[in-house]
Amino acid sequence: MATKIELIKELRKTTQASMMDCKKALEQNNDDLEKAIKWLRENGIVKSAKKLGKVAADGCIVLHSDHHKAVMVEINSQTDFVARSQELTDFAQLMISEVFKKATPTTTIEEVTQYELQGKEKVAERLALVASKTDEKIVLRRLMVFESKTNHIFSYLHANKRIGVILEVEGKFDEQDGKHLAMHIAANSPQFIDQDNVDQTWLANETSIIKSQAKLEVQDNPKKAAFLDKTIAGRVNKLLIDICLVNQKYLVDESKTVGQFLKEKNSKVIHFVRFEVGEGIVKEAVDFASEVSAQMKK
């Protein structure tokens, strides 16, 4: 038999209601899960069960930073219209302000949902209210916190609020240098700082794919086959240039690489993180006729 805590977890997973609402719903219905779900719907806490199955793949990035701390959160909604709505914008600003005050590099996104906004309602409760008003599934997807007493923290939020970057730099970097490098990361999407930081399992997998592709290309051409190893090495090297920050041509001055620019400044990138709304989420495809039909049946 499930414990009270397990029932609350299951109810939260099913309905996305707050922990306190789930606890109350179960208490009002003798720990009957189905009745608790019905109670939450009847009381307007969960507006629609159908909403829970939808994919929140749109949204916005919100961040707050100073020279020694930066916090960044991805908020997902189902449409860009809601992502740009005043309701979500107001919530995002309140939430990120509290996150900046309280969060540390080890804070989880689940912990953020329990923060109180201006000493009143919790983040999860306000989030549920915004979801109810906009009639969309809205979730806090991920969080990143950088904090340093000795190094400089920089950030960049693109104008569309769909791409955000935070980075930590050691050395003589001023505000403009930091902003430009953060903009470069936003535009060029590096995955690693340099080759020493490249995930070796990932690289081995990519190298294997490159080898297979190259072998197929030369299988009927003995002359090209003689240069197979050089071809593979060249493509792996190009891949490393593309994905490593220090190897990329610097966005502000393409006559030099990012690595050369950092060397001129006697500086070093310690960490960087780039968030882009919806990356890694498979957005559900609904044809127009089906969408209209679904709306008419509501």
UniProtKB/Swiss-Prot annotation:
GO molecular function, one term: translation elongation factor activity
Keywords: Cytoplasm, Elongation factor, Protein biosynthesis
Localization annotation: Cytoplasm
Record SUPFAM superfamilies: Elongation factor Ts (EF-Ts), dimerisation domain, UBA-like
GO terms for cellular component: cytoplasm
Chief localization: cytoplasm
Region described as Involved in Mg(2+) ion dislocation from EF-Tu: spans on this chain: 79-82
Domain of life where this protein originates: Bacteria
Function of the protein: Associates with the EF-Tu.GDP complex and induces the exchange of GDP to GTP. It remains bound to the aminoacyl-tRNA.EF-Tu.GTP complex up to the GTP hydrolysis stage on the ribosome.
UniProt family annotation: Belongs to the EF-Ts family.
PANTHER family: ELONGATION FACTOR TS, ELONGATION FACTOR TS, MITOCHONDRIAL
HAMAP family recorded: EF_Ts
Identification of the protein by name: Elongation factor Ts
